[in-house]
């Protein structure tokens, strides 16, 4: 067998450093961009409102019963209730009305620890409004419930039938004495 060799001139450069030196790693960044001292991370240095820090109390500590979501706001009028119901319908939740004749707030009558009978479970008004597409249908049911129980508490709930959970709940009507 015959073999052929082709020779070509090659030029190589060798950088011979001293035996005691090591070439620097070129992938590191300069330390100039990093802070050299730790900054103060307390709340006063993060946000400033002109030097005054004030806290707002949003819930009175006595004389105010805790109800449901939005209960710290003034009572919702019909237009605001319609917007809340439209929101839960847009989310695809099923509206339902519940009422309570005696206690519209969490209370513990039978035991000091939380349980089934502590005011969280109310009586359902009719059936959930399956297939509801308009907020006026729910508000019509609300008016019927108000007429039937003028001294009761009424709340609107939105259920997610896919996750099988209650997603929204708010007081829609309180008796005049509250």
From Swiss-Prot:
Pfam families: RbcS, RuBisCO_small. The keyword Nucleotidyltransferase does not apply. GO terms for biological process: photorespiration; reductive pentose-phosphate cycle. One of its GO terms (cellular component) is chloroplast. Keywords: Calvin cycle, Carbon dioxide fixation, Chloroplast, Photorespiration, Photosynthesis, Plastid, Transit peptide. Its main location: plastid. The keyword Protein biosynthesis does not apply. InterPro entries: RuBisCO_ssu (IPR024681), RuBisCO_ssu_dom (IPR000894), RuBisCO_ssu_N (IPR024680), RuBisCO_ssu_sf (IPR036385). It is found in: Plastid, Chloroplast. It comes from the Eukaryota. Residues 1-54 form a transit peptide. One of its GO terms (molecular function) is ribulose-bisphosphate carboxylase activity. Heterohexadecamer of 8 large and 8 small subunits. RuBisCO catalyzes two reactions: the carboxylation of D-ribulose 1,5-bisphosphate, the primary event in carbon dioxide fixation, as well as the oxidative fragmentation of the pentose substrate. Both reactions occur simultaneously and in competition at the same active site. Although the small subunit is not catalytic it is essential for maximal activity. Belongs to the RuBisCO small chain family. The basic functional RuBisCO is composed of a large chain homodimer in a 'head-to-tail' conformation. In form I RuBisCO this homodimer is arranged in a barrel-like tetramer with the small subunits forming a tetrameric 'cap' on each end of the 'barrel'. This is Ribulose bisphosphate carboxylase small subunit, chloroplastic.
